[in-house]
Amino acid sequence: MTTQNFLAEIGTEELPPKALKKLATAFAENVENELNQAGLTFEKVQWFAAPRRLAVKVLNLATSQPTKEIEKRGPAVSAAFDAEGKPTKAAEGWARGCGITVEQAERLATDKGEWLVHRATIEGQPTKNLMLDIVTRSLANLPIPKMMRWGDKTEQFVRPVHTVSLLLGGELIEGEILGIASGRTIRGHRFLGEAEFQIAHADEYPQILKDKGSVIADFNERRAIILADSQAKASALGGVADIEDDLLDEVTSLVEFPNVLTATFEERFLAVPAEALVYTMKGDQKYFPIYDKNGKLLPHFIFVSNINPTDPTPIIEGNEKVVRPRLSDAEFFFNTDKKQRLEDLLPRLETVLFQQQLGTLLDKTKRIQALAGEIATQIGADKAKAERAGLLSKCDLMTNMVFEFTDTQGVMGMHYARHDGEDEEVAVALNEQYMPRFAGDNLPNSLVASSVALADKFDTLTGIFGIGQAPKGSADPFALRRAALGALRIIVEKNLPLDLAEIVKKSTALFADRLTNQNVVDDVVDFMLGRFRAWYQDEGIAVDVIQAVLARRPTKPADFDARVRAVSHFRTLDSAEALAAANKRVSNILAKIEGEISSKIDRTLLLEPEEKALAEQVLALQSELAPLFAKGEYQPALDRLAGLREVIDNFFDKVMVNAEDEKLRQNRQAILNTLRNLFLQVADISLLQ
């Protein structure tokens, strides 16, 4: 089998930097899927992405599809011909589908009789005849939320396309993609190297682009250069570069030939909270801040240029000139905001609507204040501090700094509270109220901050569900899924003794008559328990374990988590499968009984040795496990219950549950009911697969 390397490069105008990597990897995945569907063998698919191009290179691609032998079995001979020996309609229809006549069909003898069969050899098509359509379909299936047209063309893509190159080895695959004819022209860097050049062979890519066009097409190579050079530059200044993965990817997507440089800003700006300076450096300018070894911001930053002049001074001075007004703005806002206390901004919250039916931000603030105090009391936090933090929680939204730099909400509240002389725990809570902001983010450190964070999240959940605006599909404008998961993480990971239903009831009362959904408590609790399913599945917990616990609907998250861990452990035991089956059998037996089932076992009615053994062990475990259940120590409880496997098996082997004697029957049902209730103290084990 002969192979060649294949190249597909799509030259465009500047692609969206935040989407570039996703587009490139999706392009490669789509091509790989298409090749597999076409039956074409290959070694691997490489992807390349730069601001003005997407490309894939398929290594060692077979130059043709394999030849295939097909065999299509038709109707039995007995059903293929009528009494006169003429083909039946079934036979003719089958033959027509195979592209032959009935007379051309072969016959296949089997143990079950003789059948019509069509055998054929299908020659594989040359790969060069397939790749145009494969690339076209791969591009059409890219995750592009918003397409655009350009010029007088009807074709649509994420950005205007200027060049297309499809090469199988050295052979140009002709045709059009997105209205552009495939050719050998590759465009280089806008300012460095050759503007355009010709590529003769797929093997030349991407090196020829680097050598002639001054473009590093390999996204990961550019990324590695930026990361290494940035770390080296920061180290030379005695600091450490703050390089987040998302920002690094975005910067990598903005440059074709990275040149890492450092610049400075005036030290007077360091009097402004570092978060505000960093916000504008990262968010607006795509710079990397530099910190000293103690985590203090240095008056330097790193930026990445797309050109590499002999003298970089003008570029450095240009970037310093651009960032200076933004830092000056932050300085002005900070100094202006400090002229009034946070508490003085409370009345202005009355002018901002949280939600039309739920009132203003001042209304929300008062609810948070009250609920934070309730939660603080339950978890052993300082109630007065929690209420104070709740009262001030949204005041920084009225400051100039947060109005201009929205992502500094919370953290600026902390700085302003410190300036006002507020208690440190209160000040920190103003920042930590939004934690966790995203998956994997840190949780609030103190119980006071946890109280405020939970109060804020529960207020939003209760309010929005209370007016009947639960998330639908992927739409979640109030980020309720994030709020629910964040609240669960705080309660579980800090092992807080909180009950979801109780908190939602207290939250509901604070809305007075604003809520219209009478089932708001159940709706919020069910929604939050549903978020547990996604959380545990991400952790690799089996779905049936989660379902087994959900069936009991425990509304204390820490308790829910303890049950999940216990059942997950139980599932690994040798006896788990048999006990799950036994629980299912018990459940089915009890489900058929009409009326109330007693759990009172009468020892005088125990006739068979096997039922005596089970009854005695069940009764003993009732007393033994009660303290474990009370303390939420579910794993040792299930370990003890796992020891019942043999005695349960013996019971079902030797004892007739549905005895004719009513008293015997009811007593045996009571044994099973007591047994099942012991397991149900943890979860519905019958749901384990």
Curated annotation (Swiss-Prot):
Its main location: cytoplasm. It comes from the Bacteria. The keyword Ribonucleoprotein does not apply. The keyword Protein transport does not apply. GO terms for biological process: arginyl-tRNA aminoacylation; glycyl-tRNA aminoacylation. InterPro entries: DALR_anticod-bd, Gly-tRNA-synth_bsu, Gly-tRNA-synth_heterodimer. Its EC number is 6.1.1.14. GO terms for molecular function: arginine-tRNA ligase activity; ATP binding; glycine-tRNA ligase activity. GO terms for cellular component: cytosol. Keywords: Aminoacyl-tRNA synthetase, ATP-binding, Cytoplasm, Ligase, Nucleotide-binding, Protein biosynthesis. It catalyses: tRNA(Gly) + glycine + ATP = glycyl-tRNA(Gly) + AMP + diphosphate. PROSITE patterns: AA_TRNA_LIGASE_II_GLYAB (PS50861). Tetramer of two alpha and two beta subunits. PANTHER family: GLYCINE--TRNA LIGASE, CHLOROPLASTIC_MITOCHONDRIAL 2, GLYCYL-TRNA SYNTHETASE. This is Glycine--tRNA ligase beta subunit. It comes from Mannheimia succiniciproducens (strain KCTC 0769BP / MBEL55E). The gene is glyS.
